A protein has these predicted regions:
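Outer-membrane beta-barrel translocator domains and adjoining extracellular loop/strand segments
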Residues: 136-141, 214-220, 274-277, 284-292, ...
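Transmembrane beta-strands of outer-membrane beta-barrel pores
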Residues: 128-134, 205-211, 255, 264, ...
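Residues that define the transmembrane beta-barrel architecture of outer-membrane proteins
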Residues: 106, 118-120, 182-187, 251-256, ...
């Protein structure tokens, strides 16, 4: 058995291919925001002289921030796919050298219960999670809009002018409307082992496939005519609209996690444990396969048993080392109900609450001073904290061979971050 498990892990860890040499983040930046043959995002190939480069993100900090926002939100959402519990099915403790059952139900699906496996026992599982992202902070993925503003250029000469809006062409805006279809398929292999009675060590290895298709429609909104900004044509007959698109995918190893659970208190019907979870940046952030930085969780776990119903509470703290990710408070509550000897229903409310102002910043409103005071809002994406609340409901069915078949649906309840309408999970679990 160990030989087969080792071989499977080696296959998972083998380098996975990427559909294109260019990373998905680069494709989003270049393919969706490059129009014409200029070769740079927001470069206006048809414009006269230096005017073609006045919207390039490297020259306009707010434009660069918006492209960073989109790519970072994508990679963080992919890396936050929930991982199944460290144990499932029947668990044991040893009393007088003999194994005694501490649980008989199938257990929770994503939350943790206090019981551990028991010394020398194994839990292995594999599940597949599928999602299609539908909204970004509540904005539908086919309605995301960016307004890219002109760089504040100072005309040459003896009287330079640093007032934004003067000359008048600085008031021109390039509006880009996106329609994105982003799908993620995660296959996760989990193995847990009872080091001693009351202490479990677990490893979760995800393999991620991310697919991104999108179209973008860019429109130059001139403040006045004639305008020096256009995609094609000339100042007399300017072409002010352009379309671009992308279709890319990537597959590979996600962020591997290692977890250690220690049972502190365990009676017949009540238990308390603590869990430490470390996620390592083994997934390629640029291809939207991982977070690109270390993260860790610490949880306090309490669970009880009332007949066939086993409630559990998890409360803890998440640390994230990524530049644009916040630390957060974690809270999960739920129960599993043994419907029969072979079927268990599980329900959970899972939440995550950011600490401090969100590091994933929306560029601020741009204020113009000329020819009259006015403002431009860079995007319709709200500037807010990303606090998550999800409802999860699923079932576990035990086969005559002792294998658990898991099905689950998770529903986001808040408009935070990049979210799907539903997250589907199915898998197999086995304890021995």
């Amino acid at each position: 058995m160990l030989r087969r498990v080792s071989f499977a892990v080696l296959l998972v860890l083998a380098p996975a291919g990427v559909a294109r040499a260019q990373s998905l983040r680069d494709q989003i930046r270049t393919d969706l925001f490059t129009f014409g043959n200029c070769g740079e995002p927001l470069c206006l190939a048809g414009s006269l002289g230096a005017h073609g480069g006045h919207f390039i993100p490297s020259d306009t900090s707010s434009s660069g921030s918006m492209l960073t926002l989109l790519g970072t939100a994508l990679s963080q959402s992919v890396s936050n796919v929930p991982v199944s519990a460290t144990s499932a099915g029947v668990t044991y403790s040893f009393v007088g050298g003999l194994p005694v059952k501490t649980s008989t139900s199938g257990g929770p699906i994503f939350g943790e219960r206090a019981q551990t496996l028991g010394k020398g026992r194994w839990f292995i599982g594999a599940n597949v999670t599928a999602m299609n992202f539908q909204r970004l902070r509540g904005i539908p993925m086919n309605e995301v809009t960016f307004n890219f503003t002109h760089a504040d250029v100072s005309p040459s000469g003896p009287t330079p002018n640093d007032t934004l809006g003067s000359p008048e062409f600085e008031n021109d805006v390039v509006q880009v409307k996106l329609a994105l279809n982003i799908s993620v398929l995660v296959t996760t292999f989990v193995a847990s082992y009872g080091l001693v009675d009351g202490v479990d060590l677990s490893v979760a290895v995800p393999v991620v496939h991310t697919s991104v298709q999108g179209t973008s429609v860019a429109t130059i909104i001139p403040f006045d005519f004639p305008t020096p900004h256009f995609f094609a044509g000339d100042a007399t007959n300017p072409v002010l609209t352009a379309v671009s698109g992308m279709d890319g995918s990537a597959s590979g190893l996600g962020d591997i996690s290692a977890r250690l659970k220690v049972n502190v208190v365990q009676s017949g019907d009540f238990g308390v444990s603590v869990l430490g979870d470390a996620r390592f940046p083994t997934g390629d952030e640029n291809n939207l396969l991982g977070a690109g930085a270390f993260s860790g969780r610490g949880l306090a776990i309490a669970s009880a048993r009332f007949g066939t119903i086993t409630p559990h509470l998890n409360f803890g703290y998440a640390f994230r080392d990524a530049k644009f990710a916040n630390n957060s408070i974690l809270a999960t509550g739920g129960f599993d109900n043994q419907l029969s000897g072979w079927a268990t229903m599980a329900f959970e409310l899972m939440s995550e609450w950011e600490l401090g102002a969100s590091k994933l910043k929306i560029p601020g409103v741009v204020h113009y001073l000329a020819p009259f005071p006015h403002t431009v809002t860079p995007t319709n994406i709200p500037d807010q904290q990303d606090n998550f609340l999800n409802a999860s409901m699923g079932f576990k069915f035990q086969t005559p061979k002792g294998i658990l078949i898991t099905t689950n649906a998770l529903f986001p309840l808040r408009n935070s971050g990049l979210e799907p309408a539903v997250v589907w999970t199915s898998g197999l679990e086995y304890s021995f």
